[in-house]
Curated annotation (Swiss-Prot):
F-type ATPases have 2 components, CF(1) - the catalytic core - and CF(0) - the membrane proton channel. CF(1) has five subunits: alpha(3), beta(3), gamma(1), delta(1), epsilon(1). CF(0) has three main subunits: a, b and c. Keywords: ATP synthesis, Cell membrane, CF(1), Hydrogen ion transport, Ion transport, Membrane, Transport. Belongs to the ATPase epsilon chain family. It is found in: Cell membrane. One of its GO terms (molecular function) is ATP binding. This is ATP synthase epsilon chain. It is a peripheral membrane protein. It comes from Mycoplasmopsis synoviae (strain 53). The lineage of its organism: Bacteria, Bacillati, Mycoplasmatota, Mycoplasmoidales, Metamycoplasmataceae.
Length: 137
């Protein structure tokens, strides 16, 4: 079976660099799976679950990814992001503490620009919590 070269790069390191069967993640039109020999594709990444390989395979990896960029062609998928974590490595207690702190910040009288930053951080944390809960079912 044909394989696809997946490279996930963050500002500090290469998060993943190997051959895979499929990569699935959320783009602006919804979730999309990337397979070998597919047409070229370029898009922003929406926060959500990134799945490497097929759901029930022994080498499946689930991650939570924040925003980023994806470019794919027939042979490879390249992802650039500054926010990715394996779901199994998510610390739910720490996320819930951060969520509570941000929700308390929202009750303050914040400048509009700061309010937007807090809302975006809270949205990202809620997305990670959702991904964790779906993975742990």
């Amino acid at each position: 079976m044909a394989k696809l070269k997946l490279t996930i790069t963050t500002p500090s390191a290469i998060f993943y660099d190997d051959l895979v069967d499929i990569v699935t993640l959320r783009v602006n039109l919804g979730y999309k799976g990337f397979l070998p020999n597919a047409s070229e594709f370029f898009s922003n990444i929406e926060p959500g679950t990134l799945t490497i390989n097929y759901e029930n395979s022994s080498d499946m990896i689930k991650c939570h990814i924040g925003s980023g960029l994806i470019y794919s062609n027939k042979e490879s998928v390249n992802i650039i992001t500054d926010d990715i974590v394996k779901i199994e490595d998510i610390n739910l207690d720490a996320l819930n503490k951060q969520k509570e702190m941000l929700e308390n910040r929202l009750k303050e009288n914040l400048r509009e620009s700061l309010l937007k930053q807090v809302e975006e951080k809270l949205e990202n944390i809620n997305s990670r919590i959702k991904a964790y809960n779906e993975f742990k079912k």
